Swiss-Prot record:
UniProt record similarity statement: Belongs to the protease inhibitor I3 (leguminous Kunitz-type inhibitor) family.
Broad class of where this protein is predominantly found: other
UniProt cross-references to PROSITE patterns, sorted A to Z: SOYBEAN_KUNITZ
A GO-annotated cellular component: vacuole
Full protein name: Aspartic protease inhibitor 11
Single GO MF descriptor: serine-type endopeptidase inhibitor activity
InterPro entries reported for this sequence: Kunitz_inhibitor_STI-like_sf, Prot_inh_Kunz-lg
Record bears the keyword Magnesium: no
Compartments it resides in: Vacuole
Paired cysteines (S-S): C48-C93, C142-C159, C150-C153
Length: 188
């Protein structure tokens, strides 16, 4: 029988709550640090900020709060969920708070994380939170409906790690082969 699912914990050791907001903070300090935030994508014609970035250091501003939306129940390791920046916004921009993985970017040869997604739909972008062996978590992107256009989806569950590429001097979240982003979740 499968082991009981393990709840994902925040920086205070509390179980993540779907009704609460969290900052995604990186484990690294200094230049290796930096919270995740919602920002404007270069060259985007979207009417709202539509890029998922992280600040260049942990002394930078605080990140944009997110909420994690599981398909049902609580927030557990290795479970499909949607991610949404939990901020007040005008009606036009509501969908531009919901994370999704963009189309293949020819320059970066990977897919960048952006917003403009949907929640709980077949075509939504689903993520998983997986525990690192010692401390902290990684985010994975796990497409659930074909066609699986996902160059780095390699593991048993057909998921790809979320890491960072440098786009116009900013750190943009993207699917990566190596060096995934090691993160913690800090309740807001």
């Amino acid at each position: 029988e499968s082991p009981l699912p393990k709840p994902v914990l925040d920086t205070n050791g509390k179980e993540l709550n779907p009704n609460s907001s969290y900052r995604i903070i990186s484990i690294g300090r200094g230049a290796l640090g930096g919270d995740v935030y919602l920002g404007k994508s270069p060259n985007s014609d979207a009417p709202c900020p539509d890029g998922v970035f992280r600040y260049n250091s942990d002394v930078g501003p605080s990140g944009t709060p997110v909420r994690f939306i599981p398909l049902s129940g609580g927030i557990f390791e290795d479970q499909l969920l949607n991610i949404q920046f939990n901020i007040a916004t005008v009606k036009l921009c509501v969908s531009y708070t919901i994370w999704k993985v963009g189309n293949l970017n020819a320059y970066f040869r990977t897919m960048l994380l952006e917003t403009g997604g949907t929640i709980g739909q077949a075509d939504s972008s689903y993520f998983k939170i997986v525990k690192l062996s010692n401390f902290g978590y990684n985010l994975l992107y796990c497409p659930i409906t074909p066609p699986f256009l996902c160059p780095f989806c390699r593991d048993d569950n057909f998921c790809a790690k979320v890491g960072v590429v440098i786009q116009n001097g900013k750190r943009r979240l993207a699917l990566v082969n190596e060096n995934p982003l090691d993160v913690l979740f800090q309740e807001v």
